[in-house]
């Protein structure tokens, strides 16, 4: 069977798919700073009777060929106009006037909010700061080729560090106001360790060593009957990009065993820094918690059977408890099939074993969401329960939980 492969785009573009070239569309997984160079879809289609079709066209008179070509052109034009109308409609629906629009990748199909540590970091930060926002899963990268990025009052900002600085300036939120100069310096140093070093070891485990499991979690819209093929193409292109970017970073020049040794050192450092504290920097939330959670959650819930998962759920159990604590508090709709009873009491374990898809709120506000849940489900909150009524195994939630959000107002 012959197969045809094409690239469909609604705008002019030039795509070089030679042996030594990579598609920049997938640079987000490797943290690439390259600008997004084209938009569209890779389409594969079977040519079951290739010779017969060509022979049939060749025997037709010229006027029939003209009709075929004209009809094809009209269909292509109609498809193009329909696409542009849908794009315009979407753009009209996401007006960012006085609203935070969070652009990120589509939810994976395993119930985890995102396979990208930075997307999960950014959305968790918005929930920690209690800032209402609207998700947009269009997949379009920012002008800098980054994901996630936000729109607010028609201003566009990319890069999680710059987004947080922007929101602090525009909206007056500050999760770090309880930190002194010395603590802020430690927080920044740990952030750089996590985002510039630990991240690459996770990317290796996720997109190189554990690629088959990651492919099962990846969600692609619009693939139709070729979704599995597209998923395979995306994952293997991403694998090549990750390996290339890791080599440029330097960490990719080491062996697999050495990369995992570096990962374990980073995880042990985080476990030692956390100790028995509620959050990384103490009893109060800070921006660092969104960063650390966004990365540790990948090891906790997206890398089944791997060394980082075994480490975080075994020897470094305080990191697992930390992840569960943040998940339950700021992601009440996120439940997982393999919830482990070691992190909870018998009373709460039964309810948490049921998988519930993540809700894509039109506008998400943590305060409003919990108020609605309280009114509908009549949860009674005690010092041993979180805002969803689940009992917490380590008595993390106490009577001053609501004050965690007051620090950023």
From Swiss-Prot:
Span list, region Disordered: 372-409
One Pfam family this sequence matches: GST_N_4
SUPFAM superfamilies referenced in this protein's UniProt entry, alphabetically: GST C-terminal domain-like (SSF47616), Thioredoxin-like (SSF52833)
CDD domains listed in its UniProt record: GST_C_Metaxin, GST_N_Metaxin_like
Topological category with respect to the lipid bilayer: Single-pass membrane protein
Family annotation (InterPro entries): FAX/IsoI-like, FAXC_N, Glutathione-S-Trfase_C_sf, Metaxin_GST, Mito_Protein_Transport_Metaxin, Thioredoxin-like_fold, Thioredoxin-like_sf
Domain of life according to the entry: Eukaryota
Keywords: Membrane, Transmembrane, Transmembrane helix
Cellular localisation: Membrane
Membrane-spanning ranges: 68-88
CC annotations in GO: cytoplasm; membrane
Record function comment: May play a role in axonal development.
Family: Belongs to the FAX family.
Protein name: Failed axon connections homolog
Taxonomic lineage: Eukaryota, Metazoa, Chordata, Craniata, Vertebrata
